[in-house]
């Protein structure tokens, strides 16, 4: 089943709601989602339809790695973590940068040698390649630091069979040796990575105890995951796979769209309509994705005629902030999504945007306007109106208020009172319980008013504190926290908004992968003598990167805004290259006017 973007989730839910769920029962079905966030969303929707709790469905709606974790009966201590990777790299003598250090830097973590070695090891496992094939990974390797394969390394020695491959003074890193050392280190310490889990499940033929298998986002599975799927498939009564080959965003992890395109199925259903995209936006994204060499052609009908596509050349972050603010104020019911290629770019925008006081959600796992923070803010607003707060909001106050708010008392005293009230109320969800403002002020006599709410916060990040301060000082109090969402393009998968802003800036890591792929394919890039990670502007895209931007652009229900050269210092992907795969030097307005027309029939 090869559905296209948009509301495929509802179509899949309808398919799931037929014989499997309403016949044998939901416990006989395993729904495999690619990410934890996607699994959580499916659980919520299914729970609502089945009148079941989402938590109860965790064993039946999860990622393949989560199911492998259960089948292998692992604990968290068995799984490789950031500190384990750091420790190995220190022992082996190579640099490593953890995800927290690298999240806000312009250069990517994967350009650090230890990160590249471990990522290469994982990529080889996911694509079922031997260690000797390490040079196939889409990375660029510096011959000054790394021994390349002897047939391409200028320092390799040739002669008779007794001639050593490398000179005795060659102290460059041997990548296969480092990969084998990493795998041996994991074994010595009794640790497994995500790829190791899937290998063990496949090798031991461990099967989920279900009769029906549903695999979502099938286009993003790796060869290793496909092997697990092949191990499970013969034991199922019925299998449903759903995916869109144009939406492969995890190719850098080994995802292979050909696994979807070449899969032999009994029934192949191509959904005919786009439930999200109006005609102009649909035509533009079709223009962008049409340059992919191998793909399944789709002839989609738009949700409606019209829609708006805008291109903004060389805006500043402040320009983008003003654009988003104007959007929020002009379309009072509309939703907005601002997407970047990397988290560090998103943080640059957040730094400028926080001062507006507009509440927002982060699609990534960053601690910003979380549910926890929103509940604290709602509690402060409610107390300011001298109205009762919910039991959940009261607990947030007890937990997040600074010690000074409790005067000579203790926060535990408020917790004790709330515990007693919950027992008396006998409610399953404390959000349904009310607590009068007098009780809160009795135990927290210095509970702040909105103006001081940020100053009296604890257990929050600097960004969160600044957000609360700006919110109560601004004009957007009471605004729905979900109206504005920020994230990376990857984190936006499966979501949508009325207004979508997509920054076309890339990262050195991405450009490095593009350059490596172009070199492997032997492609000529007009106007570029040497294509490296420092090439700017970027003159071409790979199919994999084109699919990523297709996902970002196809989130828009009403308006798509493309932002060219937004992020200072980031490699610039011009919009003409995005739409035509090469520089055209055409005027942006002319480019968009042409792209908004339907593609000629193939």
Name each model feature, range by range.
Residues 1-30, 41-45, 171, 196-199, ...:
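Helicase P-loop NTPase motor core of nucleic-acid translocases
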Residues 1-5, 12, 28, 100-214, ...:
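Accessory N-terminal region flanking or inserted into the helicase ATPase core
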Residues 1-79, 283-286, 554:
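P-loop NTPase Walker
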Residues 8, 34-37, 212, 219-306, ...:
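Conserved helicase motor core of SF1/SF2 NTP-dependent helicases
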Residues 56, 234-238, 556-558:
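A short helix->loop->beta-strand "cap" motif at the edges of active sites that frequently abuts
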Residues 61-63, 193-197, 482-490:
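Conserved two-lobed SF2 helicase motor
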Residues 322-485:
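Conserved helicase/translocase motor-coupling segment
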Residues 451-487, 493-499, 504-599:
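C-terminal accessory regions
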């Amino acid at each position: 089943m090869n559905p296209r973007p948009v509301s495929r989730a509802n179509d899949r839910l309808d398919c799931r709601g037929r014989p499997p769920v309403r016949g044998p029962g939901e416990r006989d079905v395993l729904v495999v989602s690619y990410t934890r966030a996607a699994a959580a969303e499916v659980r919520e929707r299914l729970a609502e339809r089945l009148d079941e709790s989402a938590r109860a469905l965790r064993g039946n709606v999860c990622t393949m790695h989560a199911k492998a974790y259960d089948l292998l009966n692992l604990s968290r201590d068995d799984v490789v973590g950031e500190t384990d990777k750091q420790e190995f790299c220190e022992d082996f003598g190579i640099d490593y940068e953890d995800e927290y250090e690298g999240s806000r830097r312009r250069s990517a973590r994967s350009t650090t040698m230890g990160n590249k070695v471990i990522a290469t090891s994982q990529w080889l496992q996911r694509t079922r390649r031997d260690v000797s094939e390490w040079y196939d990974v889409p990375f660029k390797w510096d011959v000054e630091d790394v021994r390349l394969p002897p047939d391409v390394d200028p320092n390799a020695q040739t002669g008779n069979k007794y001639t050593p491959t490398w000179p005795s003074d060659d102290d460059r890193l041997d990548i296969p040796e480092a990969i084998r050392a990493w795998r041996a280190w994991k074994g010595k310490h009794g640790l497994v990575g995500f790829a190791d889990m899937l290998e063990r499940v496949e090798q031991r033929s461990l099967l989920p105890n279900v009769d029906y298998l549903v695999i979502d986002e099938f286009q993003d599975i790796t060869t290793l995951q496909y092997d697990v799927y092949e191990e499970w498939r013969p034991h199922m009564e019925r299998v449903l796979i759903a995916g869109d080959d144009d939406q492969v965003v995890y190719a850098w992890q080994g995802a292979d769209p050909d696994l979807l395109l070449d899969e032999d199925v009994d029934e192949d259903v191509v959904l005919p309509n786009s439930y999200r995209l109006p005609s102009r936006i649909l035509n533009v994204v079709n223009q962008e994705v049409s340059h992919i060499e191998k793909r399944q052609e789709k002839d989609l009908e738009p949700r409606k005629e019209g829609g708006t596509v805008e291109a903004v050349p060389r805006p500043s972050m402040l320009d983008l902030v003003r654009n988003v603010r104007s959007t929020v104020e002009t379309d009072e019911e509309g939703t907005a999504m601002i997407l970047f290629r990397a988290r560090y770019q998103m943080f640059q925008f957040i730094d400028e945007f926080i001062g507006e006081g507009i509440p927002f959600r982060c699609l990534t796992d960053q601690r910003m306007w979380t549910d926890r923070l929103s509940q604290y803010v709602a509690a402060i607003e409610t107390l300011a109106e001298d109205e009762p707060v919910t039991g959940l909001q009261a607990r947030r106050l007890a937990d997040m208020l600074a010690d000074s708010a409790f005067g000579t008392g203790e926060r535990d005293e408020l917790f004790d009172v709330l515990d007693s009230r919950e027992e008396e109320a006998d409610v399953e969800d404390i959000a349904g319980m009310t607590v009068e403002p007098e009780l809160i002020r009795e135990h927290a006599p210095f509970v702040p008013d909105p103006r001081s709410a940020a100053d009296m916060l604890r257990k929050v990040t600097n960004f969160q504190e600044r957000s609360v301060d700006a919110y109560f000082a601004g004009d957007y109090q009471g605004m729905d926290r979900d109206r504005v969402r920020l994230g990376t393009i990857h984190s936006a998968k499966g979501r949508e908004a009325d207004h979508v802003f997509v920054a076309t800036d890339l990262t050195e890591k991405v450009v490095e992968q593009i350059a490596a792929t172009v070199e492997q394919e032997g492609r000529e890039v007009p106007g570029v003598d040497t294509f490296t990670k420092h090439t700017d502007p970027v003159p071409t895209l790979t199919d994999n990167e084109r699919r990523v931007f297709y996902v970002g652009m196809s989130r828009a229900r009403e308006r798509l805004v493309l932002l060219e050269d937004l992020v200072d210092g980031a490699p610039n992907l011009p919009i003409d290259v995005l739409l035509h795969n090469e520089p055209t030097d055409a005027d942006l307005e002319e480019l968009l006017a042409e792209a908004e027309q339907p593609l000629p029939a193939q």
